[in-house]
Amino acid sequence: MKLSDLLRLGVCVAVLLVAGLALASPPEGGYHLLKKYELGAAPGGKEYWDYITFDASTRRLYISHNTEVKVVDADSGAILGSIPDLKRVHGIALVPDLGRGFISDGGADEAVVFDLKTLKVTGHIKTGGNPDCIFYEPASKHIFTMNGKSNDATVIDPATETVVATIPMGGRPEYAVADGKGMIYDNIEDKDEVVVLDSRTNTVKAHWPIAPSGGATAMEMDVKHRRLFIGGRNKVLAIMDADSGKVLQTFPIGDGVDTNIYEPETGLLFTATREGTLHIFHEDTPDKFSVVETVKTEFGARNMALDPRTHRLFIDTGDFAPPAAPTAEQPKPQPTPVSGTFRLLVYGR
């Protein structure tokens, strides 16, 4: 090989190495508040909110708000409509191919079906007690609800709107994720473990302890690298191998975690907590994560959704009144949301 060829080869190798390092580095610039949208009071005046679902195809946010689902334009913050007359909304799952959405109504022990175009309720499906997390699993083409009161999962055929199975979970199920190939991973909040389900057979395949994390609530997955991200109410984030159940790394986080979001394009992992902290981590390698920054948000801002196009985060919260004096029935009273202060916060770079 000629000297000139060697020099050209060396330059190419150097360029590739630099490019590789750039891909492995977290994006520059900190996350901060960009916009704030007021969303108004919940019907009946009692404030409660839970999961947010973002539909990238329509640029819509479906936001649980006590007895209704608010539908919001993700770009303008305008309220496009609502799905009212529910009991206590937790989550919203969308099945665009059928033109239907499914709401977990924990107060009614049912999944409520609605039309994605008209937002009109079209059906009610009985589930286990207090359905919380709800999601569409693509391999089986079924809807799953995780039922916190009856300690089981309800499996629904969204095409026929019928229950096809009920799966005992062995504890109180919280948030779950699917790998797209048939496996589901669910937090068992009161047992400090992850349950692995096979959606093709509707059977439990494994129970994995999550120590030193505990009180598992938030769950997310890096599907490509087979990593689970488990947020615990004992203020520990655990990173787990989705094939072996081994806990690979842990990080301290704020109090009251409820949502984890992983962004494959940037390798960023976001964790939102009730105390008003947004923790941001970076996947340096599948076996090594690092802290990027911790952003101060607002108290109660623990539920969020990600827009993968703009890389912006949508987080909801409201104002809170001080907790009442302790009583025998309520030895540890919590701050209570103030009616009419519900709002959507938009964070980005």
Q: Would you name each region that the model predicts?
A:
Residues 10-20:
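Bacterial N-terminal signal peptides
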